[in-house]
């Protein structure tokens, strides 16, 4: 996110060119970041899975394999539900978490309050949330 402050892609931490799945959340790289937009298009050509989470239709939607349109203001609840699934189903890199994170057990406890079925106020169905 540091590139959002400096405006320079050189400080960003994303690695779109090597990603198998790219998550674009509430952002329009077509207008906001031409370099990131080009990387997103390369990822698409490579066959990467592109998921857009945004209530607005942006150019990225036309290149996405999945477009989620949550009710505005509910994106944090959606993120918590997604983390709930990842942690509950152990779909994360345990070694990475052990070595590089702090507070993971607290996060795991917190997301228990956000099972996907409990965040219907996002206006997304349970099957849609689970597809991500």
Regions found by a protein language model. Give the residues of each.
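N-terminal export/assembly segments and adjacent metallocofactor-ligating motifs
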Residues: 1-91, 107
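N-terminal leader/propeptide and maturation segments of large enzyme subunits in energy/redox metabolism
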Residues: 92-121
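Conserved small/polar residues in nucleotide/adenosyl-binding loops
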Residues: 122-128
């Amino acid at each position: 996110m540091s590139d959002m402050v400096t405006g320079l892609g050189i400080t960003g931490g994303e690695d779109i060119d090597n990603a198998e799945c790219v998550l674009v959340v509430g952002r329009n790289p077509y207008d906001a970041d031409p370099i990131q937009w080009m990387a997103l298009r390369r990822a698409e050509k490579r066959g990467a899975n592109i998921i857009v989470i945004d209530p607005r239709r942006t150019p990225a939607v036309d290149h996405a394999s999945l477009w989620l349109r949550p009710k505005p203001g509910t994106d944090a609840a959606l993120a918590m539900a997604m983390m709930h699934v990842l942690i509950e189903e152990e779909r994360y890199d345990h070694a990475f978490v052990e070595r590089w994170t702090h507070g993971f057990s607290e996060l795991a406890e917190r997301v228990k309050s956000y099972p996907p079925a409990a965040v219907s106020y996002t206006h997304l169905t349970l099957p849609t949330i689970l597809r991500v």
